A protein has these predicted regions:
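Post-signal peptide N-terminal segment of mature Sec-exported envelope proteins
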Residues: 40-70, 88
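A structured, mid-to-C-terminal "fold-capping" secondary-structure block
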Residues: 144, 149-253
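Mid-length scaffold segments of soluble, non-membrane domains
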Residues: 89-167
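Bacterial N-terminal signal peptides that target proteins for export
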Residues: 2-22
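Bacterial signal peptide processing site
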Residues: 34-38
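Beta-rich strand-turn-strand
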Residues: 84-86
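C-terminal motif of bacterial Sec signal peptides marking the signal peptidase cleavage site
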Residues: 29-32
Length: 253
């Protein structure tokens, strides 16, 4: 193990030639040097993941949560709902593409109808007219598309700044954040960064109450986030009807 860690440091020294994603995956692999025989089979990188979780949690409490709290307090509910609707409408475009890639006809049709109705009759998506017309959302991303076609989730990974993920979703993330996000194509940098920040803050504001409740009841926040995330993503890939998982082998003593 020491040999592999030393080799990893030599490779990391050439990080200027690595893409950000490759560097991140390298860090996760190197973290495997710290795993032991009793590691959770779904979370073999737990030491690395816990450190990233603590980093993200500290950053959230220091910056994001206070900003989201202030945003929620000073922004009228109607305006915040409009902000959420606007970004949901953008996400529905990518959901349409992934529903098509997964050969989900109903999901693709509904997503296309939602985008059309909300864009033209909902003031560019600020009003959710489609939901009033009972046109359901079918959110899909590229990670779900890979899962649909048999790509396994792989080990659980906590990404700095992005939070809980899996190896499959980490590979899909650059596609979701570039090809699948129209905001990234805005050439005006101040406008693009403003929209990114607004979406981040608005998303955090929507889960403030749930986060506070979790702080009170969760004995181990890391384990709770991991298990709930893995279950949620599994349900999303299989549209709420995941197959039964095979019993996990007992760790060697």
């Amino acid at each position: 193990m020491k040999f592999h860690c030393r080799a990893g440091r030599q490779v990391a020294g050439r990080s200027s030639r690595l893409s950000p994603l490759a560097a991140l995956l390298l860090c996760a692999v190197l973290a495997g040097c710290a795993t032991g025989p009793n590691a959770n089979p779904k979370d073999p990188l737990e030491p690395f993941n816990r450190s990233m979780f603590e980093f993200n949690d500290a950053l959230d409490h220091a910056v994001l949560k206070p900003v989201a709290t202030a945003y929620k307090e000073v922004t009228p509910d109607l305006l915040r709902r409009g902000v959420g609707n606007f970004f949901n409408n953008i996400e529905d475009v990518w959901s349409f593409v992934n529903n098509v890639l997964q050969l989900k006809g109903e999901g693709a049709a509904n997503s296309l109808m939602r985008v059309s109705v909300n864009t033209f009759f909902g003031l560019g998506g600020i009003l959710d007219v489609a939901s009033e017309m009972k046109i359901e959302r079918h959110p899909e991303d590229f990670g779900q598309t890979l899962g649909r076609w048999g790509v396994g989730a792989g080990p659980y990974v906590v990404l700095p700044f992005f939070g809980p993920s899996t190896l499959r979703d980490t590979v899909a993330l650059p596609v979701d954040k570039t090809v699948g996000d129209p905001v990234t194509k805005i050439e005006d940098i101040p406008v693009r960064n403003t929209l990114w920040t607004l979406r981040l803050v608005d998303n955090r504001a929507q889960v403030l109450k749930a986060g506070d409740l979790l702080e009170e009841i969760a004995l181990d926040k890391y384990t709770f986030f991991r298990d709930s995330h893995l279950q949620r993503r599994r349900n999303a890939v299989f549209d709420g009807n995941p197959p039964e998982e095979e019993p996990e082998a007992e760790p060697e003593q």
